[in-house]
Amino acid sequence: MKAEEWLERAKKDLDDAKFNLEGGRFEVSAFLAHQAAEKALKALYVLKFGRLWKIHDLVQLAKQVGAPHEVVDVCDKLNPHYIATRYLVETVYTAERSREALELADKVIEWVEKQLQK
């Protein structure tokens, strides 16, 4: 897949995350927010390296594509949602927690979009 296709899928995942937040499916919403950020970063990775890196660690992806410290910090906050939403851990998902994940993912997508326009 091309970088643009990865970014388009990232945006769709973010839209789906918003839909699930509105429907009260907070865990699904936070998971999709993580997926949106991951796919956005993979768009940039594919553009830079010409191949896909099969990894779910947003911090590692962000560092590999040369993200600034602020974006790496955002990724660090999003990273736990990959595991916590899929396994029965003690994390309680609320509308506020899911909304925060959406906002963080949106920041990653915005940064990636700017990089792709350069």
For each feature predicted by the language model, list its residue ranges.
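Terminal alpha-helical segments
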Residues: 1-118
